[in-house]
Amino acid sequence: MMNEPVAGKFLLEILTRGMYSNPMHVYREYIQNSSDSIDKAIEAGILQSADAEIHISIDEKGRSIIIRDNGLGIPLNITRIKLMNVGVSDKDGITERGFRGIGRLGGLAYAEKVQFVTSAIGDSTRTIMTCDCIRMQQLLQKSNNETSDIMETFKAISAFEEQPEDSNEHYFEVRLLGVPQESGLLDEDDVIRYLSETAPIDFDSQQFPQARKIRDHFSEKGFPITCYKILRGARKKPIYKLYSRSLSTGKQGRTKAKDYVRDVEFIYKEASDGKPLYIGWLA
């Protein structure tokens, strides 16, 4: 009989599969974490903004996904505790995107194993945390009594390893291994389309000449558009927003015609107290 309240193990299921209606949101969560880490690295003076990047590799045949950033990384002396924490975050919730300390758990619902690999500048060691997601599903069976609370279960599926690393390296890498095909996470075209619509990436100025005008206007109003360099595949091709100088009109293939963006106009309004109410642009 329990004498103290317990945060039960089934919370882990809620924080993984139960959090996201769309598996693609896993990409969003990891990119948010990478963006925050890059911001911290730039603020700390160990990374130039021009060199900051998030690299996504999708191996459909091998059923694996790797998302890596060259942000701050996690120092060796606090790596284990930070990666084992659940619902704990040192993010401010204002300037940083994530703040609940649960986003990284999303991948556990869509892989057989998830690895978090990280090293911080000055450390000659990298830490690898491996989460056994198959084991997690076994422990979360109603008939399984091996564990009872969320932390006991999380510890039971987690293992740590340390390996030598160049002390000048700083990064955080997420590896999703054994990703099911039916999740859609391995379809690179769908992933790129999702990221082009949701990720904090730049316009392609060659495809959309009005990009500079939009950037300049937002900066002049005090709302610069924050963008990150997100690269894909072995060739590290940049991912851009989908805007272009032309678009197709008409629903049937034979009747499709081109329409062109000739210019953009801006909308901006302030509230009665003088604070900005909204800002945007129309093509």
Spans of features found by a protein language model:
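Helical mechanochemical/support elements of P-loop NTPase systems and associated helical scaffolds
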Residues: 7, 11, 23-26, 79, ...
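P-loop NTPase nucleotide-binding/switch module
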Residues: 2-15, 19
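Interdomain "switch/hinge" adjacent to the Bergerat
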Residues: 1-6, 41-97, 122-283
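Conserved aromatic-histidine-acidic binding/catalytic patches
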Residues: 18, 22, 71, 98-102
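Glycine-rich phosphate-binding loop
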Residues: 92-111
